[in-house]
């Protein structure tokens, strides 16, 4: 119900009308990521092309998004990496605080997927002259994985624990003097990469052996990497690496996207999910239903005008059956019937060409820290 529809009502009805509108506004947020993230741009697309009343909220990453969905008033949707589920399984089983274990358990029983979005590649970057060649070589190395709450931090810790049964040695995030970026996360990554290429520079506590980056390909930061860097290969060769396939899949980093690669390289991939929760409030569930309907009705707009990652969506009105999910996850019983009964429109959208590495500008800042060939 919008404000305009409240006009002409009696005072009593008018009060109820505006109260209903205020309640609707209170439930209309999606939490995504920082403003340079693809997650944030996906949220902006949903607001612009599907649901104008949607508020797109910034965050530090996947863990923060889940916390916001469970604890922040008004947040009805979030975008997260699929392996965030395992983080809360670990909390439920192992946290020493009973209140945290109970909260994690309630959260796991409430989280629901609206739709899988796209795969993100997981990159383990080292110096070109490093003896490390593949993922299994990172044991006991110093990892730069970004701040607590970020997707890279969560995923790196999860992968490391599954491989070696212990926590990694983590380099505390820092920002090197003179390093620029649109947000702190970008500055952290650039600073860690700079120290990776300049191992003799700066204080000891800022030295990293491996920098972990995650994103949907092509990742602009990687497109600019120069000859001082190399990517560790992901090879499935033992029970520990095979166990990773419960939460992840294997893909290939394309040498055409990343000129510093000598060839296509096998990498781990994690899915990104658009999620909601099992809400008790009827008005909030009505808003979730409205959101699913808007996604159905405006699919073509998202495909034609939105971020290129919308083209990776496996669900579509022409193929409305939702794909199977990774272990532990379930679809929302509110949104699934709406999406799976969605019918295609008569229009089609032309593909949008992705930017190529050669078309990306190379700033002085990038050149100064060893980026760009």
State what each model feature region is.
Residues 17-21:
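N-terminal signal peptide c-region/cleavage motif recognized by signal peptidases
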Residues 27-50, 120-199, 317, 327:
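Bilobed "Venus flytrap"/periplasmic-binding protein-like clamshell domains
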Residues 190-194, 198, 205, 210-211, ...:
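An extracytoplasmic/periplasmic, membrane-proximal ligand-sensing/linker region
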Residues 42-48, 57-108, 189-203, 216-226:
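Pocket-flanking alpha-helical
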Residues 102-117, 257-266:
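A structural signal for short loop-to-beta-strand junctions that line the ligand-binding cleft
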Residues 1-11:
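Bacterial N-terminal signal peptides that target proteins for export
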Residues 130, 165-284:
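Pocket-lining segment of extracytoplasmic ligand-binding domains
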Residues 141-159, 248-321:
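Ligand-binding clefts/hinges and TM-proximal coupling segments of bilobed small-molecule sensing domains
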